Amino acid sequence: MFGKRKKRVEISAPSNFEHRVHTGFDQHEQKFTGLPRQWQSLIEESARRPKPLVDPACITSIQPGAPKTIVRGSKGAKDGALTLLLDEFENMSVTRSNSLRRDSPPPPARARQENGMPEEPATTARGGPGKAGSRGRFAGHSEAGGGSGDRRRAGPEKRPKSSREGSGGPQESSRDKRPLSGPDVGTPQPAGLASGAKLAAGRPFNTYPRADTDHPSRGAQGEPHDVAPNGPSAGGLAIPQSSSSSSRPPTRARGAPSPGVLGPHASEPQLAPPACTPAAPAVPGPPGPRSPQREPQRVSHEQFRAALQLVVDPGDPRSYLDNFIKIGEGSTGIVCIATVRSSGKLVAVKKMDLRKQQRRELLFNEVVIMRDYQHENVVEMYNSYLVGDELWVVMEFLEGGALTDIVTHTRMNEEQIAAVCLAVLQALSVLHAQGVIHRDIKSDSILLTHDGRVKLSDFGFCAQVSKEVPRRKSLVGTPYWMAPELISRLPYGPEVDIWSLGIMVIEMVDGEPPYFNEPPLKAMKMIRDNLPPRLKNLHKVSPSLKGFLDRLLVRDPAQRATAAELLKHPFLAKAGPPASIVPLMRQNRTR
C-alpha cells in the first residue's frame, strides 16, 4: 500500500533537430512566405485572388424570425405576401429582370432516371464533361433538408464559417493576386445626381462622350436598363454610396475604397432592398396618389426561398449522391464533387447559401441560363435543388480545372490560344444571339475537360438584353477584365464580353491581365482613361494574333468586332484540336 513510488520516466529533448521550414506572412505583399512546396498550390492559388468589392448598403437584407412554412414539391405555400410576390414573378419580363424571363426558350425534354440524372448525358448537344462553379470565399454545408417530397424551410440560423471566408471590403492586389470569380462591383445610382456630368480634365484618350442631359433611367423598381446614362462623373471614378436621399453628393474615391464604395444593383424589382431604390420615380406618371400596392416591398427570406422553389427540381440530391468532397470556393458558394450512387459517376455540386449572397436574386441565373442555353462549349447542368437554405446546382465535373492554372504556370503557344478562343467565341456567339451577356469572361470562367475540350461556366452574373431593353448599365464584373464603357457607366451590350475576351488573350500570352499590379480601383481608372492595353511580349506574337487582339480591344464598342465576326478571323484557323491542350494540363499537374 505504501510501496515505493515508481520512478518518473524522463523524456529527453529532441536530438539532431533542424529547423528547415519557416513560414510567415508578408503584410506588405499580402502573401505567405517560406511555404513548403506541397502547400503552395493549396494556399497561394486561392489566397492570391483579390476579393470582390461590395457596397453593404445594397446587400440583400434579411428579415429574421419569419414563421416557418412547409413547402411541398416545387410549389410554394401561397399566403398573402407570397401571392403578391409570385404574381409579380409570373408577370415579370426581361424589361424588369435579367434572370426571370417569360421569353426563355423551353428547356429541352430529357429522359431522367429516378435519381434525377439524364439517362445519356453524353448524347446531348453538350458533348462532354464539364466543371462547376468558381472560386470564392463562402462556405457552409446544408445542415437540414427535407426528403424528396416534403422540405422544411429552415429559419434563421448561424452557419459555421469557412476558415477562409472572404471579406466584403476591397483589398489591394499585388502582382500575384487574382480576383475571385463573380461580380466585383455594382454601383447603384442615387437620385438627384447632377445631370450632364462631364469627364474629368486630362483624359485625352477617352473617346466616350457624355450626354449633355442625363435622363434618369430607373423607376422606383428594378435595375436601370434603358440607354440614357445617369451615373456619376466617370472622370473622378466617383462611386457613390447607396442612399435614398437625393441630396448626397458623389464622392471621389481615393486609393482602395471603403467597403461602402462599391455595391451591386438590385436586378429584380420585388427583390430589391429599399436602400437601393431612388426616392422618386424616374419618369413622372399621371397625376394622382401612388397606389400603395405598387411600392417596392421587402421580400423576406421565406418568400424568396418559395419563389426560388418554383424554378428548381423537387427532391433532395442526397438521396442519390454520396461522398461529397469540397474542391473549391466561389464568390457565391462552395463547389464539391460527389458520386452518383447508382453509377459511380463523378459530378460537381455547387452549394450556395441563400442567406450569404450579395445579390440573392442573381441565384436565378445559376439555374435559368445553363438550363435554357445548351451548347457543347457551355458547362452542362443536370439538376438544381433547394436543400434547407441552400441552392444546390448539380453539374458535370470538369477534371481539367480552370484555364487560370494553365495561364499562370505555363506558356501557351498560338495553336493552343486559338483553340481556347475558338471554343469561347462559339459559346458567346450563341449566347449573344439570344441576348445573353456573360459579364465575367476571364480565365477563371473557362474550364477544361480531361481531353482538352473548353467550356464556359459561371453564369451567375449574366444579363439579358432584348428589343425592350437593348442595353444594360450595371457595374458588374471583375475590375481587370472590365470594358471601358462599363466602367464609365455608359450603356453597354454583349460587346463587353468581347473586350474581356481580349484581356483573357493577354492573360494567355503574358500570364496575367494588364494593370494586375495595381489596386482594383486604380486599374479600373487606367482602363477607362488610357489607350487599349498592349501585350508585354508583343515581339513574341505573330501578326495574325496581334490583328486578332486589335479587333477585340477597341475602345469604341460600336467598332468592336462581334463574336460572329471574330469566328471568321484568320487567326482562328491556327486552332488546334482539343488534344493540343492536354500537354498544358499535364505540365501543370507535374510542376
Curated annotation (Swiss-Prot):
Function according to Swiss-Prot or TrEMBL: Serine/threonine-protein kinase that plays a role in a variety of different signaling pathways including cytoskeleton regulation, cell adhesion turnover, cell migration, growth, proliferation or cell survival. Activation by various effectors including growth factor receptors or active CDC42 and RAC1 results in a conformational change and a subsequent autophosphorylation on several serine and/or threonine residues. Phosphorylates and inactivates the protein phosphatase SSH1, leading to increased inhibitory phosphorylation of the actin binding/depolymerizing factor cofilin.
Organism from which the protein derives: Homo sapiens (Human)
Record's GO cellular component terms: adherens junction; cytoplasm; cytosol; focal adhesion; Golgi apparatus
GO molecular function: ATP binding; cadherin binding involved in cell-cell adhesion; protein kinase activity; protein serine kinase activity; protein serine/threonine kinase activity
Bias-annotated ranges (Basic and acidic residues): 149-164, 292-301
Domain CRIB per the UniProt entry, residue ranges: 11-24
Region entry Disordered, spans: 95-301
UniProt region (GEF-interaction domain (GID)), positions on chain: 298-323
Catalytic activity: L-seryl-[protein] + ATP = O-phospho-L-seryl-[protein] + ADP + H(+); L-threonyl-[protein] + ATP = O-phospho-L-threonyl-[protein] + ADP + H(+)
Residues where ATP binds: 327-335, 350, 396-398, 458-460
EC number in record: 2.7.11.1
PTM description: Autophosphorylated on serine residues when activated by CDC42/p21. Phosphorylated on tyrosine residues upon stimulation of FGFR2. Methylated by SETD6.
Membership in a protein family: Belongs to the protein kinase superfamily. STE Ser/Thr protein kinase family. STE20 subfamily.
Tissue expression pattern: Highest expression in prostate, testis and colon.
Sequence positions bearing N6-methyllysine: K78
Post-translational modification Phosphothreonine, affected residues: T187, T207
Gene3D superfamilies listed in its UniProt record: CRIB domain (3.90.810.10), Phosphorylase Kinase, domain 1 (3.30.200.20), Transferase(Phosphotransferase) domain 1 (1.10.510.10)
Activity modulation: Inhibited by INKA1; which inhibits the serine/threonine-protein kinase activity by binding PAK4 in a substrate-like manner.
Name of this chain's protein: Serine/threonine-protein kinase PAK 4
Biased composition (Pro residues): 271-290
GO BP terms in the entry: apoptotic process; cell migration; cellular response to starvation; cytoskeleton organization; dendritic spine development; intracellular signal transduction; negative regulation of endothelial cell apoptotic process; positive regulation of angiogenesis
